[in-house]
């Protein structure tokens, strides 16, 4: 499969947005808020629940209550999704700031894929630096993915011909130097994950610093939400490099927004290999205890308005889920059918 970034914006225009809502339709996060597509009859929410001891895997439908725009909803179905096919996108930061930690990322990433992937699952691998490159397309082979991960290398060279998209397609930028993190998230979500079904997650191994992307963090968030993908940024950084260069390390804020809005979470591991392995283990545990809750909304009008979702499962549990959606007709609703 050969992909390019033809749907991405030119330097003079932002990416094509969703149909703009009328002023009265704008939700609490504004017109640029993330979109969770639904069908007319069903809203699906992937979520995890934790208490002080870790993830909780024993919840039943009657334990939870969901409200949409403060109106109670009747939960139609709630199941644990251990066996639903899983699609994983691994995004690997290969910019110069990752020189000292790339070997850790390669070792832990390959181990994670060996342990998680089953024959019904698929994963792909993207690297990003001054370019965004597809190192491995969808495959269920951990060995093939490991080979691709091990071929990743640090790239600090400048490009005079713009930044190529996935598969070598044009992705114009006015500043071809840097770390194209936001562009990579957009391309992974829009070009690779949006057309997939089942559970979808994106794991980003990065220091969280973006430099030179044509897109903004809000564009990356919107693309991830439209693809119905849960994003887990793993912040791995040799911060000493920043101090030695006289620069501030400020990578956590944008990644926190991306994780929160998509129902994922940020895991900060510094430059510690053991913590990185633990981070992957935490994500595995979360996938094994993830729930899919479905309800038929009382407001069945797919009018594009923002609907706030409040999910509570009591018992002092911390619920990790997206916070709402725009009711877009004909969109993906979670793929449980």
Regions found by a protein language model. Give the residues of each.
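Bacterial N-terminal signal peptides
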Residues: 1-2
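Scaffold/interface architecture of coatomer-like assemblies
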Residues: 5-337
